[in-house]
Amino acid sequence: MKKASAGWGQAGQQAEQHYLVEPRHLAGGGDLGHVTEFLRASGWQDRSPRAGVPVIFDSPDRTVRIGYDPYTQPGGWTIRGTATGQQDAWHATLGKQVPVEIVAGFTDALTRPRSAHAPNVWEPLQQHGWDTEQGQHVTVMSPDGNAFVQFHQGERGQAYWWAAAQTEHGPAWNAVFTPTTPMHLVQAFTTALSDPQPVMRPRGHVPPTLRVRTTSVSVLPSQLSAWQQARVTAARAATWARTSWASTRPRKNPTGPYATAGGARTRR
């Protein structure tokens, strides 16, 4: 992250100490707003109770629900997709210590049109030096040996995607995706997981482990606000572009001259 120019922000602001933490998979949970504000700006409905816990968001078409509850066991994120067309119902759980930047890789992808390219869950990991281990289960291990992604094939035909991280104190978090989870979403997760860029945490919120590297930085509150707002603004712009295109798009006429061409379109 580039150092912001001096004097940026309102006069008299007091800089606050933050830390850039790497690897990101050991950075701790982080600010839930990184996920929820993007969803809200993308047109998702906030169904959370007034107290704000648990967090509940529904997609605009009500086919996906995202929840976060730190008080249930084991606690964390639960994401459910209903069966639609050729897509089976699916379910994903991510522990409460999964860094929000990694959670957002998955949840942000839910707000965007699906790419026409065939997804490859392993590709982002391999591009960033994660090692593949072949065995009963295909496993890809992080360069520091503290995180992995696995396609777990159990007995009786049971299978699921499993990711986890650990420190010298034991397990840090895990994430599980049913095999019916859309592959482009799992790839979005592995892309965010393997991103080598550090993530920022305020003082007092860096996990107590010797397996992370930290860089101290001074940040103005206005800088933090501007970075957060840029993410929200991008979500609003993308949502506006999609809804604007949908509202101005000519309706299909099954009996008109474009009936055949319209049916041949590839959906993204």
Question: What would you call each of these model-derived segments?
Answer:
Residues 1-268:
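Compositionally biased accessory segments in Actinobacterial proteins
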